[in-house]
C-alpha cells in the first residue's frame, strides 16, 4: 500500500521569509476559509517566530490574532503549529524558565496544537524545558534540528541530538533546513536513521528554496519515511521562501505516494487574497530580491531571507571600505565584488567560530562578524578586531554549546580580553521574572488577561507591549507606512545632465579648413556621434577622412 505524506502550509513563515510583517487578524480571518477549502493541508503554521512581536509592532493585540486565526482550522480538523526558539522562546535573547512555561500554557489555550521548538546551536539542554513544558500544557512537542552543511554536522551528530530529545519525551522531529543547504542524500539518510531507531516518531521536513536543493530534499526525505512536508502558495512561494504545494504534491504523486486532492479554485482564491494583502500594505516591506533564487547561497550557507538585510549592511559600509582602500593606495571595489568577499569571509569565519548553524540569531552573528572583519582588513587592521557583545556570548558558551571547536586564535583572543568561558546550563543564568512583571502590571492598572495571556506578552516583549498599550506602536507604524506609500507613489524624476556645446569660432574654423564642406542635420535634436551604451558619445577627431555616404553621427530628435 502506498505511503501517505501530509502537507503543512507555513503561512506565517511565508510572510516572514519574504518581508517584515504578517497580515492583520481581519485578513487572516478572510483567507482561512479558502485555505481550508484547498483540502490538501493537514497542518497550518499559524503563529510563533516573530508573529506575536510584529503584531505588537503595528499596534495590534497578538493574543486576539492567534485565537481568531487558529479557530477556523480547529473547526475544520486541521492542526495548527507554531515556532519557538528554545532558550529564546519568541524573541532574540534568553527567556526565564517561568516565562517559557507560561508561553506553552497560553498558546495551547489560544488554540495552537503543535510547538516546533529549535535551538540554533542544536544544544539539547536548551530544548529539554521546551519538551517538558509543551507536553505539560497538552501540546504536541516537535523538536526541530537546525540543519546545515559542514564537516561536523553529520548524520551521527544529528542522531546524538535526536537521542536526547526523544529521551526527554518529544513526540515529533522536524528537519529545519532554514537556509535550504542541506544535501538531499544526507537528509534522506538522517530521516531513515530516525525512522529505523524510533519508528513511532513523526518526522516533518521544512526547507527554503534559495539555493535550489529543497525539492530534491523533499523527495529524498519522503522516500526515507518522512510524514509531513512544509509548503507554500503563490505569490509567496519559491524564490528564497518555500516550495509551492502544487509542485511538491505532483512530484510525490508521480513517485507513488498517496497525497490529498487539491482544489485549484481555492488555491487561486488564496493566491488572490495573499496578493491583495501584499498590495494593501505588506508589500511595502517585502524585498523584491527574496523572489529570486541564488546559487551563491550554497557556499556561504546564509539563509536566503537575510539577503536583503545583508545587502543593506554592505551598502552602509561600502563607502568606508573604499575609503580605507584609497588610504592604502589600493583600487576601490564595487558592491558585487564586496558581496563575493563577504561570502568568502563567512566561509572563513564560520568554522573558526565553531560552526554555529546559520539560523536566527546565529546567522546574524556570523554575518556581522564577517562584515566587521572585512572592514578591519580593508582598513589595514587585524581580523577579529571588532566582535560584538552578542557574538562573544555565543563564543563563550552563554547561549549553549557550539557544535564545533573554536579556532585557537579565537580562544587566545578571549583570554587576552580576560573573558571566561561558561560551562553551565544556559538557562541557569536567567532567574524567574513573572513576579516582577505581575507587580508592574498591578502598578500600571493592567489586567493579566484571559489565561494570563497579557501577562505573558508583557513578560516576553516588554518594550513592544508598552508601545502597543500606549498607542505609540500604531502611530509609529502608520507614519512609516505613509512614508513608504508616498515614496512608492511618487513620480520618478529622471535627471538628465546638461550637455554644454563646445565653444568655437566658426570663422576661424572655415579659415583653417577652406575646402571643408558643411553638413546640414536633417532634423532638430541632439547630436550623438556614436551609439555607445556604456560610455559617453564622443566626436570624431578633427581631420578624420569621411567619404560621401558614410554615417557621421546620429540625431536624437525631441519627443513628439
Predicted regions and their residues:
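Active-site beta->alpha loop and helix N-cap motifs at the rims of alpha/beta catalytic domains
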Residues: 33, 42-43, 48-163, 179-180
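Conserved, mostly hydrophobic/aromatic
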Residues: 14, 117, 165, 173, ...
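Short beta-strand-turn/beta-hairpin segments enriched in glycine/proline and small hydrophobics
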Residues: 505-537, 545, 551-560
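Structural preference for beta-strand elements that scaffold enzyme active sites
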Residues: 4-10, 14-16, 41-45, 77-83, ...
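Catalytic cores of alpha/beta
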Residues: 153-165, 211-227
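Glycine-rich phosphate-binding active-site loops on the catalytic face of alpha/beta enzymes
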Residues: 117, 177, 224-243
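Terminal or standalone catalytic/regulatory effector modules within metabolic enzymes
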Residues: 15, 36-54, 289-297, 301-517, ...
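C-terminal helical cap(s) of enzyme catalytic domains, especially alpha/beta-barrels
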Residues: 237-262
Amino acid at each position: 500500500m502506498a505511503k501517505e505524506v501530509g502537507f503543512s502550509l507555513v503561512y506565517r513563515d511565508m510572510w516572514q521569509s519574504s518581508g517584515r510583517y504578517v497580515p492583520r487578524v481581519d485578513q487572516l480571518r478572510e483567507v482561512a476559509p479558502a485555505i481550508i477549502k484547498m483540502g490538501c493541508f493537514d497542518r497550518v503554521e499559524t503563529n510563533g517566530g516573530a508573529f506575536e512581536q510584529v503584531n505588537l509592532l503595528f499596534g495590534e493585540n497578538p493574543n486576539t490574532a492567534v485565537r481568531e486565526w487558529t479557530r477556523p482550522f480547529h473547526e475544520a480538523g486541521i492542526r495548527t503549529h507554531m515556532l519557538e526558539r528554545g532558550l529564546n522562546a519568541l524573541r532574540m535573547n534568553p527567556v526565564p524558565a517561568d516565562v517559557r512555561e507560561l508561553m506553552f500554557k497560553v498558546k495551547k489555550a489560544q488554540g495552537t496544537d503543535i510547538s516546533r521548538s529549535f535551538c540554533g546551536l542544536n544544544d539539547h539542554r536548551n530544548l529539554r524545558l521546551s519538551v517538558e513544558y509543551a507536553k505539560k500544557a497538552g501540546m504536541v512537542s516537535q523538536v526541530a534540528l537546525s540543519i546545515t552543511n559542514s564537516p561536523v554536522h553529520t548524520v551521527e551528530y544529528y542522531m546524538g541530538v535526536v537521542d536526547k530529545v526523544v529521551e526527554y519525551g518529544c513526540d515529533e522531529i522536524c528537519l529545519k533546513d532554514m537556509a535550504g543547504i542541506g544535501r538531499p542524500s544526507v537528509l534522506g539518510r538522517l530521516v531513515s536513521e530516525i525512522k529505523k531507531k524510533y519508528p513511532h516518531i513523526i518526522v516533518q521536513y521544512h526547507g527554503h528554496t534559495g539555493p535550489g536543493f529543497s525539492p530534491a530534499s523533499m523527495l529524498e526525505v519522503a522516500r526515507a519515511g518522512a510524514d509531513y512536508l512544509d509548503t507554500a502558495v503563490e505569490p509567496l512561494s519559491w524564490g528564497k521562501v518555500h516550495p509551492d504545494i502544487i509542485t511538491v504534491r505532483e512530484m510525490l504523486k508521480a513517485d507513488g505516494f498517496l497525497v490529498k486532492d487539491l482544489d485549484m479554485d481555492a488555491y487561486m482564491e488564496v493566491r488572490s487574497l495573499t496578493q491583495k494583502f501584499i498590495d494593501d500594505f505588506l508589500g511595502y516591506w517585502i524585498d523584491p530580491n527574496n523572489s529570486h533564487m541564488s546559487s551563491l547561497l550554497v557556499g556561504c550557507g546564509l539563509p536566503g531571507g537575510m539577503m536583503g538585510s545583508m545587502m543593506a549592511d554592505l551598502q552602509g559600509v561600502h563607502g568606508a571600505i573604499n575609503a580605507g582602500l584609497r588610504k592604502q593606495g589600493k583600487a576601490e571595489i564595487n558592491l558585487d565584488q564586496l558581496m563575493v568577499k563577504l561570502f568568502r569571509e563567512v566561509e572563513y569565519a564560520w568554522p573558526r567560530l565553531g560552526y554555529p548553524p546559520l539560523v536566527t540569531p546565529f546567522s546574524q552573528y556570523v554575518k556581522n562578524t564577517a562584515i566587521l572583519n572585512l572592514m578591519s582588513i580593508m582598513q589595514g587592521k587585524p581580523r577579529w578586531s571588532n566582535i560584538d557583545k552578542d557574538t562573544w556570548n555565543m563564543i563563550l558558551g552563554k547561549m549553549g554549546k557550539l557544535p564545533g571547536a573554536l579556532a585557537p586564535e579565537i580562544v587566545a583572543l578571549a583570554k587576552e580580553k580576560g573573558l571566561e568561558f561558561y560551562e553551565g546550563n544556559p538557562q541557569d543564568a536567567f532567574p524567574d521574572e513573572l513576579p516582577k512583571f505581575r507587580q508592574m502590571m498591578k502598578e500600571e492598572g493592567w489586567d493579566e488577561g484571559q489565561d494570563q495571556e497579557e501577562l505573558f506578552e508583557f513578560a516576553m516583549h516588554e518594550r513592544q507591549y508598552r508601545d502597543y498599550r500606549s498607542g505609540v506602536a500604531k502611530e509609529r507604524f502608520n507614519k512609516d507606512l505613509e512614508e513608504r506609500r508616498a515614496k512608492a507613489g511618487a513620480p520618478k524624476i529622471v535627471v538628465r545632465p546638461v550637455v554644454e556645446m563646445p565653444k568655437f569660432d566658426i570663422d576661424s574654423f572655415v579659415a583653417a579648413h577652406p575646402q571643408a564642406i558643411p553638413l546640414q542635420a536633417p532634423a532638430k535634436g541632439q547630436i550623438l556621434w556614436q551609439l555607445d551604451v556604456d560610455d559617453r558619445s564622443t566626436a570624431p577627431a578633427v581631420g578624420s577622412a569621411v567619404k560621401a555616404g558614410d554615417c557621421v553621427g546620429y540625431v536624437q530628435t525631441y519627443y513628439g
